[in-house]
Amino acid sequence: MNTASLVRSLSRVALRSSQVVRMAAPRHFSQSAKVLSVTPELQQALNREIEAEQQLSSDNLQGAVAPTFAGFQVTNKDAEVRLTKKNGSEDILVVFNVNHSVDMDEGFDDEPSQAVAPVPVAMPPFTVEITKGDQRLCFHLELVPVDDQPDEYDFRVEEFYVAPSAKNGNEDVPSEVYASSGKYIDPDLHDLLFVRYLEERGLDARFCKTLVAYATHYEHSQYVGLLDKIKKFISK
């Protein structure tokens, strides 16, 4: 990984920690000191960060080309991503949000001695809704890395339930709907419902890998977009 990647991987952690050190020292202000705006310096810092992030995207995240989900249509609005597909009489909806989906502590040592810093990946929780008629079968899932298989991912069902289908754009689940934890289920049901049933609908290990790749790419683009919005805001 090149220097730009290292900057990207560490910037959200290393810069924050260095700021804490500086803020810990007492600050003495001269009564006669001329008040200077921080804006020019902040603009320069934002430009440097945006340039480093764009270089990382070019080197490691396929630039502006986002991964694609086989069989799904993708729509997004700000931090939210929605995947939809038809499966016979079923309407399948997958929703995830990339806010706070990158664990910046994962893969970093206390001492910054690594020659190659890991590129942080986004692993957002996601929901799956399978709608037939006036009902929908819903799953809340977490992404998990596969042990001893780098860059491979699986999902864990955290919660599942059956709810009325969404009507007139209202996707809220009524509070009286019973939901069960995915941690406590018969092993046979786990294999049939959580694994094979979802695999038949395209929600398998390949889907998980694509979701992580897409979310990482999309979260990164949202972060760069946020920096650019801040730069434009302070320049007004």
From Swiss-Prot:
GO CC, alphabetical: mitochondrial matrix
The keyword Transit peptide is annotated on this UniProt entry: yes
Annotated transit peptide: 1-36
Coiled coil: none
Keywords: Mitochondrion, Transit peptide
Localisation: Mitochondrion matrix
InterPro entries tied to this protein: MAM33 (IPR003428), MAM33_sf (IPR036561)
Main location: mitochondrion
Pfam family, one: MAM33
One BP term from GO: cytosolic ribosome assembly
Superkingdom field: Eukaryota
Family in the record: Belongs to the MAM33 family.
PANTHER family registered for this protein in UniProt: COMPLEMENT COMPONENT 1 (PTHR10826), COMPLEMENT COMPONENT 1 Q SUBCOMPONENT-BINDING PROTEIN, MITOCHONDRIAL (PTHR10826:SF1)
Name of the molecule in the record: Conserved regulator of innate immunity protein 3
Species in which this protein is naturally found: Caenorhabditis elegans
